[in-house]
Amino acid sequence: MVRLVLFDIDGTLIHTNAAGITAFGEAFREVFHFTAAVRDVTFAGRTDTGLARQILRAHGHEPTQADFDRFFACYLRWLQHILGRVGGGIFDGVGEFMTDLRGQAERPRFGLLTGNIRRGAEIKLNHFGIWKDFEFGAFADDHESRNEIARVAQRRGSERMGRPLAGDEILVIGDTPLDIECGRAIGARVLAVATGHFTVDQLKEHKPDWSVKSLADLPAAEVLK
C-alpha cells in the first residue's frame, strides 16, 4: 500500500505561464549577458541545476559554484517579480485529489520530488498557497539528476517514517516521461498526468501505472491500493 506520495510541481500541481523559464532567461541576461539563453532549450522534466550547467556550457563557460550562486540568487529575485504579474494557478482536480488522499483511512504522507531548487519551489508554491501542504521534498539543490533526486526523496521519506520505504510504497506523480523514469528508478508506482506538455497517449508510451488527463480523473483510493 502507498505510504508516501511525491508530487512534481510545474505542469503537475501548478502552471505559471512560463514564469520560471522567463526568470531563467532574465537571470542569464543580467548575470552573464546571454541574450537568448533559453531559446530552444527543453525545460519539461529537467532540473534547474542541470539546465543552468547545460546553458553555461553551451556558451563556452564551465560553471563554478560561485557562478551557480550568482545565477540562482538573480533567478530567485526575477521569479518572485514575474510570478506577481503573469497569473497562472493550481490545476483543476489537484485540491480535490489531495483532500481525497487525506480522507483515506490510512492517509499517506505528502512530499515534493521536483527539478526546482528548493527556494524556487517554495516561492512558486507559496504564491499559490500550497507550500505548507508538503512535509518535505527533494530538489535540484540535492542533485542535478532527477533519478538521484528521487532516491533522496525516498531516503527522506524513510527517515520520516522511521523505517525503510519500499519502492512500491511510494507513488510518484508527474507530467513528463522523466517523471515516470525517476519513479521507476526507485521502484515506485507512477501516476502520469497530461496537464503539462505531453498527452495521455505520449505518457502511456513510457508505461506509467496510470495516465490521466488530470488528477480529477482518478479516485485517490485507486492509487493507494
Tell where the protein language model's regions lie, with residue ranges.
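Helix-loop "lid/cap" segments that line or gate small-molecule binding pockets
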Residues: T49-P63, A153-R155
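Asp-based, Mg2+/Mn2+-dependent phosphohydrolase catalytic module
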Residues: M1-R3, P63-A66, G95, T99-R102, ...
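Active-site nucleophile and cofactor-binding loops and adjacent substrate-binding regions
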Residues: D40-G45, T114, D141-D142
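Short, acidic loop-to-helix structural element flanking the phosphoryl-transfer center
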Residues: L6, Q80-L112, R118, F134
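Phosphate/oxyanion-binding active-site loops and adjacent basic polyanion-contact surfaces
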Residues: T16, G20, I90, H143-I149
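Active-site neighborhood of HAD-like aspartate-dependent phosphohydrolases
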Residues: M1-A44, G50, L56-A58, V200
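Membrane-embedded alpha-helical bundles of multi-pass transporters/translocases
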Residues: L4, Y75-L76
